[in-house]
């Protein structure tokens, strides 16, 4: 006879929350460190810096290089689709909703900046390496692979 596993109330509630989240989408409105997106977009850069992570604060406390400044000005403008090689610019709330084509060393990866990306580098969203997908062994790789039919 197999004993039944007891299910805790906690796990039932967790599953119910997960199912509800899947139905409704985002559970609550976006906020970054207690501030809504509209508040963040209305802030000046010097008001916003204390909210960013230490690495981003340090990066913005130093001056931006020429390429970063050019991209920053383009992102603040009205242009929709922007192509760039600059991967080390940190996403600010003013950039949300813009579409960027970022170079990954081989091709341009197109993505839209979302509120969840605030405080991250642009380069994090266009990966430079492909995920390795291994297939079967090649001819001569093992002793048994000699007898595999060639394509």
UniProtKB/Swiss-Prot annotation:
Q: Name one GO biological process term.
A: ribosomal small subunit assembly
List the SUPFAM superfamilies: Ribosomal protein S19
Question: Which stretch is the leader sequence?
Answer: none
Query: Gene3D superfamilies this protein is in?
Result: 30s Ribosomal Protein S19, Chain A
Cross-referenced InterPro entries: Ribosomal_uS19, Ribosomal_uS19_CS, Ribosomal_uS19_euk/arc, Ribosomal_uS19_SF
Determine if Ribonucleoprotein is one of this entry's keywords: yes
Membrane-crossing residues?
A: none
Which key words tag this protein in UniProt?
Ribonucleoprotein, Ribosomal protein, RNA-binding, rRNA-binding
Example of a GO MF term = structural constituent of ribosome
Gene Ontology cellular-component terms listed: cytosolic small ribosomal subunit
Q: Which domain of life is it from?
A: Archaea
Q: Which Pfam families match?
A: Ribosomal_S19
Q: Could you say which protein family the record assigns here?
A: Belongs to the universal ribosomal protein uS19 family.
Function of the protein: Protein S19 forms a complex with S13 that binds strongly to the 16S ribosomal RNA.
Protein known as: Small ribosomal subunit protein uS19
UniProt organism field: Picrophilus torridus (strain ATCC 700027 / DSM 9790 / JCM 10055 / NBRC 100828 / KAW 2/3)
């Amino acid at each position: 006879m197999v004993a039944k596993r007891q299910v805790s109330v906690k796990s039932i509630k967790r599953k119910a929350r997960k199912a509800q989240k899947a139905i409704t989408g985002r559970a609550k409105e976006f906020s970054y460190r207690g501030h809504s997106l509209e508040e963040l977009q209305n802030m000046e850069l010097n008001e916003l810096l204390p909210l960013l992570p230490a690495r981003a604060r340090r990066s913005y406390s130093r001056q931006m290089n020429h390429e970063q400044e050019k991209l920053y000005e383009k992102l603040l403008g009205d242009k929709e689709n922007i192509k760039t090689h600059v991967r080390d610019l940190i996403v600010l709330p003013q950039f949300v909703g813009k579409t960027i084509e970022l170079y990954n060393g081989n091709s341009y990866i197109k993505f839209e900046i979302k509120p969840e990306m605030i405080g991250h580098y642009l380069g994090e969203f266009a990966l430079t390496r492909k995920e390795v997908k291994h297939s079967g062994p090649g001819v001569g790789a093992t002793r048994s692979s000699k007898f595999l039919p060639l394509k």
